[in-house]
Amino acid sequence: MKISKGKKLLLLGLALVVIDQIIKIVVKTNMELGQHIYVIGNWFQILFIENEGMAFGMKFGGAVGKFLLSFFRIGLFAALCWWISSLVRKSLDADGKPALLADGSKRVPQGVLIGLTLITAGALGNIIDSLFYGIIFDYAPFMFGKVVDMFYFPIIDTTWPSWVPFVGGNHFLFFAPVFNFADSCVTVGALYLIFFQYKFFARSDESEEKIEKSVK
């Protein structure tokens, strides 16, 4: 049985969410908060922390901010799902085959759909933490759960030379944020779209119509 493009994207998204949640639950149930596990030297560590805010540990204004952030995440997730669904329909012609432009390229490249699916799966992974982890692990009400983070890459941990203006003698750490698999999905998906699929987003519907009419 042939699987439709939409179902393939759904399966990809669900697989990414499952991987994200497995990693988080393993860390949450087997590590103490703040515990380090050194994977490769000092520069790749599993560091169990929880944050109440956005990606990479950024925070957003207390209880009210947390509530608004949860609503924002849900709205963003719904918008992304709608966008992907509309692009899937747009990518197919009346016979269910890939819709092509005059130059032979696909009207909606597969890479665009995959990139958006990565972002959507990452958003859902962190939404699950925010909505349900407080209830599941019995520490907060619905929508006030904390996001589990664990990947830490302090690749450069040093001190600025004293002769460097303004920052001399100060501690320098790169890369400081602690993040999770869902954050990685969002980041990889966004960077992929920016660097490899920018032509699709630069192309307007009006320009598509002109191209299509030129060959009729």
Residue locations for each model-derived region?
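Alpha-helical transmembrane bundles and membrane-interface segments of multipass inner-membrane proteins
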Residues: 1-216
